[in-house]
From Swiss-Prot:
The gene is cro-HTT. This is 8.4 kDa cro protein. It comes from the Viruses. Keywords: DNA-binding, Repressor, Transcription, Transcription regulation. GO terms for molecular function: DNA binding. InterPro entries: Lambda_DNA-bd_dom_sf.
């Protein structure tokens, strides 16, 4: 089974929709895509972007799945 990437999640929901539901600009979402992760604030409890993206996905992805996929991966 192939793991879905963070970019695939965001692109399947659409950048403009993610930006709208999160109250951000598309440029901010493209920065997430460049980093391949959700912002730090998602993991410190300051924001709930994964919940909003999950809702916008219409059930295709859960918030927990988005957080797991959206954790920055460091490859050495």
């Amino acid at each position: 089974m192939n793991e879905v990437t963070f970019g695939e999640v965001i692109k399947s929901v659409r950048v403009s929709v993610v930006a709208d539901v999160c109250g951000l600009t598309p440029k901010a979402i493209y920065k997430w895509l460049e980093r391949g992760s959700l912002p730090r604030t998602e993991f410190t409890g300051e924001t709930e972007y994964a919940d909003k993206i999950a809702k916008a996905s219409g059930g295709k992805y859960s918030a927990a799945q988005i957080r797991r996929i959206g954790k920055q991966q460091f490859v050495m």
